[in-house]
């Protein structure tokens, strides 16, 4: 299907992009296009303007900061995957990025585009929710920060106001944590039927801290905060893991579609949870 008609505008600087967004409501920024182009072809979106931001090199970086690791919104998955800072300081993000799409998607797709699209089955929103990352949104009048847990509001819906653009992601460094990312897909390159991102800090075999998030099984990334709170201080063993898997499965609200039923996704979550904990035990 052909996309609807729109006007194409290319920004040469961040300030130019923000000024344009401020004055033109029905505008969609174009970064890698891996999410936007398919949605245009399906006519899910019908913007008046497409704002090409690919020349905004000031949004393409990975660097250490006081808050951990800062990543520019235009940083492509390929660059995240090959970056030594991400490998050493945010291994959960590195592991998840390896599983995203195929080489074309990783070469073109950007972290900012993925989280702005907010597909509940997408990989990066789940990772950022588990890591308690912060999203920086900029507009012509200034910037503000939103926790990932609050940024994703529902399917393809975020806490982005008129005239705002995602410009940076700040990811805490979790020293002393073991991390793992797992997902089930129908075929290579697909969005996840279900996914789990786990970061856990152990003292011996006792859980000192835990962060547990799921994708593809709720209307947005699901952070199992009630489960997290209840298992801190407990010894990690098979019985506890089975209990965690069962409780998470009862708390999620998976969709049923052509890729899998709600029941099937709940069962997948149980299996993924047990596999994730087995890997970090």
UniProtKB/Swiss-Prot annotation:
SMART domains: CO_deh_flav_C. Pfam families: CO_deh_flav_C, FAD_binding_5. Its cofactor is FAD. GO terms for cellular component: cytoplasm. Its main location: cytoplasm. FAD binds at residues 31-35, 110-114. PROSITE patterns: FAD_PCMH. Heterotrimer composed of a large chain (CutA), a medium chain (CutB) and a small chain (CutC). Component of the glyceraldehyde dehydrogenase which is involved the nonphosphorylated Entner-Doudoroff pathway. Catalyzes the oxidation of D-glyceraldehyde to yield glycerate. When the artificial electron acceptor 2,6-dichlorophenol-indophenol (Cl2Ind) is used, the enzyme shows a broad substrate range (glyceraldehyde-3-phosphate, formaldehyde, acetaldehyde, propionaldehyde and isobutyraldehyde), but is most active with D-glyceraldehyde. It is not known which acceptor is utilized in vivo. This is Glyceraldehyde dehydrogenase medium chain. The lineage of its organism: Archaea, Thermoproteota, Thermoprotei, Sulfolobales, Sulfolobaceae. The gene is cutB.
């Amino acid at each position: 299907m052909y996309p609807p008609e729109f006007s194409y505008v290319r920004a040469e600087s961040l300030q130019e992009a923000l000024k344009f967004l401020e004055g033109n409501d029905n505008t969609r920024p174009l970064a890698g296009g891996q999410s936007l182009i398919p949605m245009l072809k399906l006519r899910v979106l019908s913007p008046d303007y497409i704002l090409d931001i690919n020349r905004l090199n000031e949004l393409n970086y990975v660097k250490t900061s006081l808050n951990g690791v800062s990543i520019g919104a235009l940083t492509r998955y390929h660059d995240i995957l090959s970056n030594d800072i991400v490998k050493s300081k945010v291994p959960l993000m590195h592991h998840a990025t390896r599983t995203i799409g195929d080489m074309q998607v990783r070469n073109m797709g950007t972290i900012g585009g993925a989280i702005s699209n907010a597909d509940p089955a997408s990989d990066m929103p789940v990772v950022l929710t588990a890591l308690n990352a912060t999203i920086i949104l900029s507009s012509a009048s200034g910037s503000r920060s939103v926790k990932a847990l609050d940024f994703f509001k529902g399917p393809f819906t975020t806490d982005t106001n008129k005239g705002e653009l995602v410009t940076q992601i700040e990811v805490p460094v979790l020293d002393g944590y073991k991390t793992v990312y797992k997902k089930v897909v129908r075929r290579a390159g697909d969005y996840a039927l279900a996914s789990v991102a786990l970061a856990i800090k152990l003292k011996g075999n006792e859980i000192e801290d835990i962060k547990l998030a799921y994708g593809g099984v709720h209307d947005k990334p699901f952070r199992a905060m009630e489960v997290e709170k209840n298992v801190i201080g407990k010894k990690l063993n098979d019985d506890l893991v089975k209990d965690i898997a069962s409780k998470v499965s009862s708390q999620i609200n998976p969709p049923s579609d052509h890729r899998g039923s709600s029941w099937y996704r709940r069962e997948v979550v149980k299996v993924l949870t047990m596999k994730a904990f087995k890997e970090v035990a």
